[in-house]
Amino acid sequence: MSGNLRSANYFVSIASRFIFMLGANTFSCQPTTSPTAEPESLDARTQRHLRNLFWLCYTIDKDVALRTGQPMVFNDENCDLTLPPGYVDQLYTSMAYHHHSRELPDNPIFPVDLRLSVLKSRAYSSLYSFKALQKTDADLLKEIRELDDDLEQWRLSVPLEWRPTLSFSHEMPDPNVSMHSVMLRMNYHLCMTIIHQASSRCNAWAKGHGGVMEGVSSSLALSVESSRSTLLYLEMAEHVLMDGIFW
């Protein structure tokens, strides 16, 4: 599907129907209570596999919606968004393992941090959906501030070794550049861009209203800086990028 959003949209729509039929959108895997617990039953392994498929489709669906402007297939109100057991701890352990080894880790590494996918879903619903397009300037800026706060909380939760910086320049290269760290940073900058780019819809931008105009200008400046950082980082990380990973 690399580079073909139409195909991605088509196949995700089909896959989502199977996910709904199997109920993978409404159940979450239970954590193992003890390290000496019995091996997983076939039903438990099946549920875990289906849940991973749900998260994979969910992740792709959010990117497709933001890139095409078409409505999302997965509505958060109809999904259990409980993260897989131990997801956050295993994410960075797997990233560190993969950074120093070419072997595949035991736990799946999704294309995007699942918490960012949930944030993308909220950003689309709050800023770009049909309902969101009817919001007043005040409501729109309120949503932008709340999403920006949540994105910053996510950034600060990332271990310092992998934490994206607010902006990027060649004077401060990423010491842990790898495929997964690249995707982490790219998706952080993408979220920053799509959140603050929405401020360009404010009427104050066209009418030049004083106080509101200052807030809109600072928001747009963040969007531009994030886009700039994306281009600079891609240039720096070109040597680790694989063919077909970007659409």
Residue ranges and their predicted role:
Residues 1-31, 35-81, 99-153, 157, ...:
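Extended, leucine-rich alpha-helical cores of fungal transcription factors
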Residues 163-167:
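Short beta-strand elements
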